[in-house]
A protein has these predicted regions:
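Non-catalytic scaffold segments within catalytic domains of secreted glycoside hydrolases
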Residues: 1-62, 66-71, 80-417
């Protein structure tokens, strides 16, 4: 292989896959999202139901991930399971997550654990959710109890998944619970609460576990057309909140970068995905099943933004991926994204991981099970796992620390039952 064909990643670099509890575990009946999915008039195309049954199949899935050669697994512990009613903590659920963590260690896979990944306990939402004045203290107490029960098995802890995108999703766009639109006052309260929740939640985790702690942010690569300045579109509001989290991350052990595409903003506002699934699913060479522009190069720009904005806090790429029915396109996307990582490393940026989203084809929130992000398929009836060629390709990268061209893609696949 020539130098143009191979990038060499550093010793100890983590390459793995990411997931979120509500999207793969199944039966998350005490969560706000479970209620949201079953509410009359819900925007969700289908309910999460049993999801991928990861709750009962985690050993199989972690063994599968390790068998590919991947060395890191990001997953979330579900607040709605650990504290299903206010002040009532489930030791059985903490024990369950200890088993998940132990399985990671058994297979020499580093667990990267998120304490809050989008879904809330239903009772928290009933109290006012992210906009409630009580939210930071409730999250702090939960983090203290969860880290107290799990801390000795953690390798990395992420406080909140994409807190920079949650306020607009729930209070401006209405695509997440509680489903309000245009409520800027509630959005601002949620923003302040999430900033404080990260501070106090992170401190609670550190008090219980000697592990690196950070926040993971939603970072599309925003590009303005010539002559166009910042506006107040939801994605720009998110970006301004990202900047505030970057300031907090100066004191953190790492910051997580989660990037899928770029968003170009012109005089008519952001040029992005159509909200209608029937149009989104018409995937083209230039777009994905989410309606996103196919632009893996976005990752290099957002890594550098995070590095610059935090003053040099180490970077974990905690999500990068593509929804596609064409696995060769997935491999090409991952290769291009990894080239951006290699370029950032060459420029002196301290990037420590690349985690692909997602390990499994999973529940993609309001779009249900239609977008296919996974390295592994999951039969909706039998739950049989069907590894894709992309899983083997990424595993080979993890084993060798070399990023070959997609001409070297192994197209073999097998069904695991």
């Amino acid at each position: 292989m020539t130098n143009e064909e191979v990038a060499v990643l550093p010793e100890g670099f983590l390459i793995g896959a990411a997931t979120g509890a509500h999207q793969i575990e199944g039966g998350n009946v005490n969560s706000d999202w479970w209620e949201w999915e079953h509410r009359q008039g819900t925007p969700c195309l289908e309910p999460s139901g049993d999801a991928c049954d990861f709750y009962h199949r985690f050993r199989e899935d972690i063994a599968l991930l390790a068998g590919f050669g991947l060395n890191a697994f990001r997953f979330s512990v579900e607040w709605a399971r650990i504290e299903p009613a206010e002040g009532e903590f489930s030791q059985a659920e903490l024990n369950h997550y200890r088993h998940v963590l132990a399985s990671c260690h058994e297979h020499r896979v580093k667990p990267i654990v998120t304490f809050h990944h989008i879904s809330l306990p239903a009772w928290v939402q009933q109290l006012g959710g992210l906009a409630s004045d009580r939210f930071p203290a409730l999250f702090e107490r939960y983090c203290d109890r969860a880290a107290g029960g799990l801390g000795d098995l953690l390798d990395y802890a992420c406080t909140i998944n994409e807190p920079d995108a949650l306020p607009t999703g729930g209070y401006i766009l209405g695509v997440n619970p509680p489903g309000r639109t245009g409520d800027k006052d509630a959005m601002r309260r949620a923003e302040e609460n999430l900033l404080e929740a990260h501070r106090v939640g992170g401190a609670a985790i550190r008090s219980q576990a000697d592990v690196p702690v950070g926040v993971v942010l939603a970072l599309p690569d925003i590009q303005y057309e010539d002559g166009v300045g910042p506006g107040d579109s939801p994605i720009e509001l998110n970006s301004r909140l990202s900047d505030r989290f970057f300031e907090l991350a100066r004191d953190d052990d790492f910051v997580g970068v989660q990037t899928y595409t770029r968003v170009r903003i012109g005089r008519d506002g952001p040029q992005g995905a159509d909200v209608d699934w029937e149009q989104r699913r018409s995937e083209t060479p230039e777009t994905t099943q989410m309606g996103y522009e196919y632009y893996p190069q976005a990752l290099g720009n957002t890594i550098r933004r995070a590095w610059r904005s935090t003053g040099g806090t180490p970077i974990l790429v905690t999500e990068s991926g593509i929804a596609t029915s064409i696995d060769e396109k997935r491999v090409a996307y991952i290769e291009a994204a990894l080239r951006e990582v290699e370029s950032a490393l060459a420029d002196g940026v301290n990037v420590r991981s690349y985690l692909y989203w997602s390990l499994l084809d999973n529940f993609e929130w309001s779009l249900g099970y239609r977008p296919k992000f996974g390295l592994v398929g999951a039969d909706r009836r039998t739950f049989a796992r069907v590894p894709k060629a992309s899983a083997y390709w990424l595993g080979a990268v993890a084993r060798t620390r070399h990023v070959p061209t997609t001409r070297g893609c192994d197209t073999s696949a097998a069904t695991v039952r």
